[in-house]
Amino acid sequence: MYQLFTANSKTEKILREYINSRENIKNKLDKLKENPYKANSAHQLHGKLKGKWACWLGSNIRAIYIIDLKNHQIIIEAVGTHKIY
């Protein structure tokens, strides 16, 4: 299982707000920790975000993250609507 981190305090604050306002996001984060490659329709990004991953945390909420294989960590860089791309 992977550990979950945020890249900065702004992302952490936004993620906490979503967790507090939506019941199912915590469950989706748990699924992400189990398998960051397939959970919540995870997919690799292209273009300027190449090397990063994205997944759905809710109907219109996405997370952009990096997978650190060596340390078994998921580092969430951004959370929000599709505008975060």
Question: Predicted regions span which residues?
Answer:
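Hot-dog-fold acyl-thioester-processing enzymes
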Residues: Y18-R22
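Short amphipathic alpha-helical segments
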Residues: E23-L29
